[in-house]
Amino acid sequence: MSPPHVPPARPAAAARYTGTAIVLHWLLALLIVGTFSLGVYMHELPFSPARLKYYSWHKWAGVSILALSFLRLAWRLTHRPPAAVAMPGWQAGAAHATHLLLYALFFTVPLVGWAYSSAAGFPIVWFGVLPLPDFVPVDKALAEMIKPWHERTAMLMAALVVLHIAGALKHQFIDRDGLINRMRPARG
């Protein structure tokens, strides 16, 4: 008598992040992709009322990213993430470095944008209601020095977001290790 067929073992279900961490992750993801896309789009527009409106929206979203980043960092520092999924050391190191750089850019990109806007003499009024203080004094020469740094750091963040998504998709479709479920919104 032959032994019964035993299906191959599936990887153990990965522990999930907290609901708050998941909500903050996806809110930031949507805001970052939307703000970056708007920045690329509005950059090429001729000077017009529409362009000014888009710049205001871009700045509102940037300040929102900054505020949510402070919340996300505070949550992350006070709530341990779930245990990591087993993976080769180089992948774990690459994932860790990518996350650290993303967190740094969550703060750097909006702060450099705020400094640029302040130096250029364009105040930020968050959602048209809350005027924010200038980050640096008005100085057109300084604004021209800061502007490319906002663009470069935004491009670096976009590249890291693409790398982050590629890594998640690799785990989902190649490794099939359930890693992506750790941050997937709960199904009702």
Language-model-detected regions and their locations in the chain:
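Membrane-embedded alpha-helical bundles that constitute the cytochrome b-like, heme-associated redox core
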Residues: 1-188
